């Protein structure tokens, strides 16, 4: 934007030329002196003259600065109808700044963000590897558990089967014999043990032995003995 007012503003009366106030003030003082006549000197002091001179000097200095900044339009107009360049540039040349980073962050902040992102990625990768390792260990532990469980179960089943077969064989061997009394003798304990009340079972053992030896003894063939016999 130009520092000079537009010509249209002068035509519309929006901008007016500066008025020399020093001349008006001087005329006013002269009129006052004429009105007072000879008594005007009584009201005049040296300070009044100094103030008037200072005011005139200030007005002249202000007028000079205005004429330097705003020269007459008719003198500055060129043939092309455009304003000439001002004596003093309105603005200095704009300072050229180097292009900033697209992110708008200073270099230390940008570097810190990059390091932070790198640490986060490394931590995520480490967590992922640890998770996969834990899952693999858990699967292996489950497989080992079922493998050991099945192995132990098979061993227990095999042991139980052997013990069952052994028991059946023992029962079969004990139950074999020519007579029922022989099988009974194999199932009972014939050792000489004292009874709790001091009674001896020797007589009973002798009776069972004699019955086992006699193939014709009652009940030797497994038949029920009647009361009449």
Swiss-Prot record:
It comes from the Eukaryota. The modification Phosphoserine is found at residue 229. Keywords: Coated pit, Cytoplasmic vesicle, Membrane, Phosphoprotein. Residues 1-24, 76-132 are annotated as: Disordered. PROSITE patterns: CLATHRIN_LIGHT_CHN_2 (PS00581). It is found in: Cytoplasmic vesicle membrane; Membrane, Coated pit. Residues 107-132 have a biased composition (Basic and acidic residues). GO terms for biological process: clathrin-dependent endocytosis; exocytosis; intracellular protein transport. It is a peripheral membrane protein. Transmembrane segments: none annotated. Clathrin coats are formed from molecules containing 3 heavy chains and 3 light chains. Belongs to the clathrin light chain family. PANTHER family: CLATHRIN LIGHT CHAIN. Clathrin is the major protein of the polyhedral coat of coated pits and vesicles. This is Clathrin light chain. It comes from Schizosaccharomyces pombe (strain 972 / ATCC 24843).
